Structures are given as structure tokens and as C-alpha cells.
Amino acid sequence: MQPASPVSGDAGPVAEAVPPRGAPQVLVRRRSVPFSPDSPLAPGSRGGGERRSTFREDVSHAAAETYLVTRLAFILLRYLGVGYRWISQLAALIIYAILLMPGFIRVGYYYFFSRQVLRSVIYGDQPRNRLDLYIPRDPKKPSPVVAFVTGGAWIIGYKAWGALLGRRLAERGIIVACIDYRNFPQGTISDMVSDASDGISFVCETVGAYGGDPNQIYLMGQSAGAHIAACALLEQAAKESRGEQISWSVTQIKAYFGLSGGYNIENLVDHFHERGLYRSIFLSIMEGKKSLPHFSPETVAKKLCPETIALLPQIVLLHGTDDYSIPFSASETFAGVLKQAGAKAKLLLYEGKTHTDVFLQDPLRGGRDKLVEDVISVIHADDADAREKDALAPIPGRLVSEWQIKLAHRISPF
């Protein structure tokens, strides 16, 4: 398969953007509707005040998605064949999930029943073009917004994986939009990046309708989602610097947070193969070996002109030093390349933390979460009132027993 452009230029238009960082741009805009806290948009609805979906439509969508996931699972099994690595990884994943199930159940209850969660808001016309919104309770002013692209090895990503992060940030006055996207084999990397870009465009254009501040939009991705979001960001910056028509502007993004991401996938093919993501599957996801440089943000960043680099927002890369799914050197090297190119890049390493410690085990443990605090410190850097509230914020309670978390840490397939 030939390399495809990672983002689509014909996604929905955007709302009024922040002042540009120095490049011409052609933004396509559409009407948005002011936010009304008394009448939140229903799950399954479109943004901008469009028609809400009916119960029958929701049931029909759920049935169609279930059928689709089942069919794609069998297709994926044909790709995987019988291999001890992925079978052992699957077994470890099942045990890992059972150990953390008490926490997952409590987060799931919040996800399905909290009035602060708007599930399956439609952002595009492709399958799985939906996102979940986590809305702060009783906001007194427009809230900062984080557009979050979930991980999942490009195969098992799902918007609900961001529920715990969404809850924690919403409790601190930040709106979170968890963007779903087509996974493999339903789509390949260009589809994933295109979906993510369309989701970001939707957030930028409708943020005001949900009580968000259009001048405080942040982009974040975790694991494969960090890679996808970085691809979308760099491609959008390149298109913007060339003066092409765009559906959202990188100048609307105040900062990008990349958590446990891989940014030079050319260097990770063999590593992933040893971890159970077989080379043949990974190259199919990435649309062939020739496409690897095109979808490696680190490689792309080396070739960007100074005008494009100047458009990029602050980039914050976060990684655990004991991450064996994606070594922390991936973030370390990418940060160095960005700095050398003139970008504003910052690297935060979490000593002794694995791929899932930072994102799952630590938040389930309760107490002050280092990752959440680091992200909030960037978002609230210019808001003295918010920082005062952060200092007095309630400490989250424990969701899973310590022995279960420690055992899950040892068994985790990630």
C-alpha cells in the first residue's frame, strides 16, 4: 500500500482561533452554538446544537458496533495466526484486568452513569468517529480543554480507555475530549491520523458549545495515541506553513502532551516484534516499510523548515524509565530532535515507572497523581485562581488494593 497523507484536509471547520504564531492560514469555519449548562447535549448527538440521537438509534449503533468489532476480531486473528508471544500477552492481559477489576468497575460506573460524561458525541462520518466529553461540575467560567487520543497498540484503542484521566482532570476544572478512531484492521495509520485530526478539528470548532475556552485547547496522546497525535500535529503544521486550506490550526493548541509514545517507528519495528506485535502486522498497520519515515514524527521533525517549527506549541513528553513496551529513550531522542530544530520541548521522566504505572496503576492507587499534577501545572500555569484551587483540591481515594496493584505491575503485558 502506498503512503497516504496522515490527515484529511476536508474535516469540519473550526471556530475562532487564537492569534497565529506566524504563518498564513486558510481556516474553514462553521457556526457553533453557545454553551448552555442547563441543557447538555446528549450522548450520541452532534456538536453545535444539532439533533440528538434517539434511544432506538443508540441501540442500533451499539448492535452495529458489536457486530463490527466481532468481525474485525476474526480478521485480526487471521493476521496473528498462532504465536506464543501474542497468546502469552493475551493471557497476561486477562489476569492483569482481573486484578484491577475493582477499580475498572468503579470507573465504569462513573463512565456510564455520571451526568458529567457525554458519551459518543459524533465528530465525523467515518466508523468510530465519536468522542466522549468529561465536563467539570458547575464551571464558573469557560474551562481549559484537553483533546485526548487514547492508546491501544493501534489495534485495541478505545475512547473509554481515557475515562480515569478524564475524571481526574474534570474534577480539577478541565474539559477532556477522548477521541475514538478506527483501529487496525478497520483502518491503517493514515486513517487513524485522519480520524484524530478530524476529532481535534471538532473540538476546536465546538469547544464553546460545551463550556470550553477556545484560547485554552491542549492536545494529549498516550502510547499509540501519542504517536498518532504527534503525526497529526506535525502534518497540520506543515500544511499550515504552506498556506493550504486547513480545518484547524496548530496555533489553537497551547501545548502537546505525549505520554509514553514512540516517535521513530523505524527504530521500533524489531522491538515491537519481540514484544508480540509481529513485524508483518505492524508493517500492515503502517502501510508498508516505505511509509515508516512518513509516520515517524522524529524523522519528520528533522525535515521541517524553521517556519513550520515556529508554529508548533510547547511540547511536553512524559515517560516512565522502566517502560519496556516503548523505551523511554523514544521520548528522550524526540525531545532532543525537537530542541535542536528550535521547538519548545520539555522531557519529564518518571523514575521506575512502567508503561501502565503512570497511566493506570498510579491513578487507581489514589492520592496525588504525579502525571495529573504535571499536566495540570502546565494548563494552569497562567491562572493564579486555578492554582490556588489546585492546592486545596480533595485528594482522590484509593480504587484498588495495594497488593493487587503491585501484582498487576508485575504481570502487566505492557
Swiss-Prot record:
Residues forming the catalytic site: S223, D323, H355
Coiled-coil region: none
Highest taxon of source: Eukaryota
Keyword Cytoplasm part of the UniProt annotation: no
Membrane topology classification: Multi-pass membrane protein
GO molecular function: prenylcysteine methylesterase activity
Binding site for substrate: G151, G152, A153, Q222, S223, A224
Alphabetized UniProt keyword annotations: Endoplasmic reticulum, Golgi apparatus, Hydrolase, Membrane, Transmembrane, Transmembrane helix
Catalytic activity annotation: [protein]-C-terminal S-[(2E,6E)-farnesyl]-L-cysteine methyl ester + H2O = [protein]-C-terminal S-[(2E,6E)-farnesyl]-L-cysteine + methanol + H(+)
Main location: endoplasmic reticulum
Enzyme Commission number(s) from the entry: 3.1.1.n2
Compartments, record wording: Endoplasmic reticulum membrane; Golgi apparatus membrane
Region (Disordered): 1-54
Function per UniProt: Catalyzes the demethylation of isoprenylcysteine methylesters.
Family label: Belongs to the AB hydrolase superfamily. Isoprenylcysteine methylesterase family.
PANTHER family (UniProt xref): AB HYDROLASE SUPERFAMILY PROTEIN C4A8.06C, KYNURENINE FORMAMIDASE
Descriptive protein name: Probable isoprenylcysteine alpha-carbonyl methylesterase ICME
Organism of derivation: Oryza sativa subsp. japonica (Rice)
